[in-house]
Amino acid sequence: MSILSLPVAADTLARVFAGAVNPAPKAAVRFAEIPGRTSQATIPTRYGPVAATLYHPPSDVGCPPVYVNVHGGGFVVGHPEQDDPWCRYLAANAGVVVVNPDYVLAPRHRFPAAPQQIYDIVCWAAEEERDWDGTRLCVGGQSAGGNLSAAAARLALENCTPVIALQVLHYAPLDLATPTRDKPSTIVARAVLKPWMGEVFDTAYIPDRAQRLDRLASPAWGANADEIVGIAPAVVVTAEHDRLRDEAHRYAEKLHAAGSLIEYHEVTGVDHGYNIMSGALDVTRAVYSRIAGHVARATGSP
C-alpha cells in the first residue's frame, strides 16, 4: 500500500497542492478579445452559501438560457476563475448566462458533499425567479467539474427535477474506483496527470475505497449506469493522451445505450487540461465552438 493512500498523507499533500497551484490559463488561450459582462451572486446550499460569478450574453435580448459551469481541480483545488475564458466564450457564443460557482472542497468536505452542493446550485439555477429561463438549463465542467456535473445530472434524474437540457463532460474522471496507476496514457511518463496525483486527489476526496464505487463518484464503473434511461442528454469530450480518456469513453457508451449521448468527441494530439495548461489556441477554439453549438441547440438559443 502506498503512503499516499493514507488520508493523513493525502490530506497534507492536497492542501499543499491547493495552495501552490496557479491554474490561470496560458495567455494564448485566454480569449482576451471577448469582453465579459459579469455580476456576482450568492447561492444558498445545504452546505452554506457559495459565491458565484455570472457571465451574461453580450446583449440583453429576451430571457436567456442558463449554463452551470463546474470548475476542475481534482476535488481539492478551488479556482473557478480558471474557467473565465471558457465562461466568457460560452456566454458570447451560445447566448446563455453562465453561472460559475465555488463549491466545497476536500479534504475539509469529503464525498458526497461536492456533488450534493452542485446539485443544489443546479436546482437554484432552475428556479423561476431568476433573471434567465431556468427551463432551458445545462450543466457542465472539465476534469473534476465534469465528474460533479455527471453526478448532478444523475441526482436530477433520480429526483425528477430539475430538467436538464444538456450535460457537458469535458475530460472528466468518471471511474474513481480504478486507481490512476492502472489508467494508461499514450505518452506514459509525459502525461499531465501522474499516478501519484490521482492517488492524492482520490484519497483526499474519498478515503474509503468502497465508497468510490458509488454511482455519483464512478458513473462509468461496473453496473452504475445500468439505470440511467432518461438522464440528461450528454456531450462527452476527451483528450487523446489523457489517462481519463478510456473511462469517459466507457461512460459515453453507456449514455449511448440509454439514448442520452449527443456526441462523443476525442480531441487528438492533446492531454488533460490542454485548454488551460497549453497554448493550443486553435484546438481549444475549435472545441469551445463545438460545445457552444451543442449548448445553443439544446437550449434553443439563437
Whereabouts are the PLM-identified features?
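A glycine/proline-hinged amphipathic helix-loop "lid/cap" segment
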Residues: 1-58, 211-212, 300-302
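Short beta-strand element of the alpha/beta-hydrolase
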Residues: 63-74
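A fold-wide structural signal in alpha/beta-hydrolase
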Residues: 66, 95-99
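Alpha/beta-hydrolase active-site loop signature
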Residues: 74, 103-107, 174, 271
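Catalytic nucleophile-loop/oxyanion-hole region of alpha/beta-hydrolase
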Residues: 79-80, 86, 99-136, 278-284
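Alpha/beta hydrolase fold serine-hydrolase catalytic domain that processes acyl esters and thioesters
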Residues: 135, 150-302
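Gly/Ala-rich beta-loop-alpha elbow adjacent to hydrolase catalytic centers
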Residues: 141, 145, 149
